[in-house]
């Protein structure tokens, strides 16, 4: 039973619980009218201390489509946080008004702190460069729906692997499925953190390699997961300017990929995927965004005990 559980990290749920969510998400995708009122009377609080378009709107749309309502803020300056209110007090206050919290925060571990003071489920919608579990559910559902299998794939992850919370969460989740291999493509400065390499990949004897060439990595990939170089994570903006255009996926590079390769991106895109790639049948990132809404509908329905 997922009722009243927190989702702070992909490892909080078992593979069987993932499958429960994916099964319900598929049912909602195919028959949305059946689920349009199951969360009637429920309220989601969206607490976004960092900017967001897709994640926030996806959560809001998901709850509204389930018949529920949404309260919250999209920037801390519009809340009592700007007056110095602690995260603890914000969470305890929101518990008085809502049935469920989705929170994005710039500090790693903030979702864990929030869960310690919450009697209602807390969903981590991104905590700094740490984890982004609902994006991971989105990614897994997209692969399952359009690729058919979460096992036995070669996954190339490209771009900002150091600060990219979506990358960290996805590796953590896909490492739990059999026979997956990883190709980690990044500049030296943006390599995957040691804790991912040592505690997840090496500890579990998962095959991986680290390279700097997108052209090399794309040849073997069943799934290519592109990410943007994140300006907001850099202290030195000159370093960002030097690295921001290091990887650009275009049709010329796509010619070196498998015919059935899947291109994913958590979005927003800056210029790491050329617009011409959007017309390629292997581009799945907008389908991925739609899957995000359905998987969040399924997740919230489960956490609220309504499905």
UniProtKB/Swiss-Prot annotation:
Binding of carbamoyl phosphate, residues: 54-55, 104, 132, 135, 267-268
Binding-site residues for L-aspartate, renumbered to this chain: 83, 165, 228
UniProt pathway: Pyrimidine metabolism; UMP biosynthesis via de novo pathway; (S)-dihydroorotate from bicarbonate: step 2/3
Keyword line: Pyrimidine biosynthesis, Transferase
Domain of life: Bacteria
GO BP: any one term: 'de novo' UMP biosynthetic process
EC number, as in UniProt: 2.1.3.2
Entry GO MF terms: amino acid binding; aspartate carbamoyltransferase activity
Broad enzyme group: transferase
InterPro entries: Asp/Orn_carbamoyltranf_P-bd, Asp/Orn_carbamoylTrfase, Asp/Orn_carbamoylTrfase_sf, Asp_carbamoyltransf, Asp_carbamoyltransf_Asp/Orn-bd
Catalytic activity: carbamoyl phosphate + L-aspartate = N-carbamoyl-L-aspartate + phosphate + H(+)
Functional summary from the UniProt entry: Catalyzes the condensation of carbamoyl phosphate and aspartate to form carbamoyl aspartate and inorganic phosphate, the committed step in the de novo pyrimidine nucleotide biosynthesis pathway.
Family: Belongs to the aspartate/ornithine carbamoyltransferase superfamily. ATCase family.
HAMAP family reported for this sequence: Asp_carb_tr (MF_00001)
Assembly description: Heterododecamer (2C3:3R2) of six catalytic PyrB chains organized as two trimers (C3), and six regulatory PyrI chains organized as three dimers (R2).
Protein's name in the database: Aspartate carbamoyltransferase catalytic subunit
Gene coding for it: pyrB
